[in-house]
Amino acid sequence: MVNKVYTTEIAILTAAKKIFSFKGKDGATMQEIANEAGINKALLHYYFRSKDLLFEQVFFEEVKKFSPILKNAIAQEVDLYQKINNICEAYILMAIENPFVPVFVIGELNKQPDLFIQKMFDGDLPDFPKLAFQIKQEVEAGNIKPILPQHLIMNMMSMCVFPFLMKPMFIVGMQIDKELFNNLMLQRIKEVPKFIIDSIKI
């Protein structure tokens, strides 16, 4: 019985992840999720009373895995170039493995940004001020081109996440299939930090 309950719950979470990925929380229905999971709607409501509760569990299970990886990449005592590589790799690998997460994040940030960010990181936010200070020190030492730390951080984050948010447009507009898109994203693990580092090198 316990195994059956576990199997059913996993089927629901897997189905919900797929439906939410394509339609978002507002566009998805519990009936669609039940159909995808191969169960009836009443059983779905037995496990999850509302779409909001199901959405939160699906999303935060994935985000909670990523949060410590990002925080560690930012907090590591390594040189700036290595840190840029580490952050880009963490972001892009997360998005490759969980392509729905960036879409979820944007949706929730537009609703309750402060609450969402606190919940996402359990109140322990990544140390972006430390990263900004490290960039500032490198600029002042003449090791990299003059740039506001905020611009460098935003450039890096944008280049990591934006292709995943615009995936449908890129696939249609550039006439590529999903396999090629995924291969391009894997290449960006190296391409993005190289582009960023080349832009600040003296």
Placement of each model-derived feature along the sequence:
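Basic, helix-initiating cap at the start of DNA-binding domains
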Residues: 1-23, 28-36, 52-56
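Short hydrophobic/aromatic patch on the recognition helix
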Residues: 37-48
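Short alpha-helical scaffolding segments that buttress acidic/His motifs in well-ordered protein cores
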Residues: 88-91, 105-108, 156, 160, ...
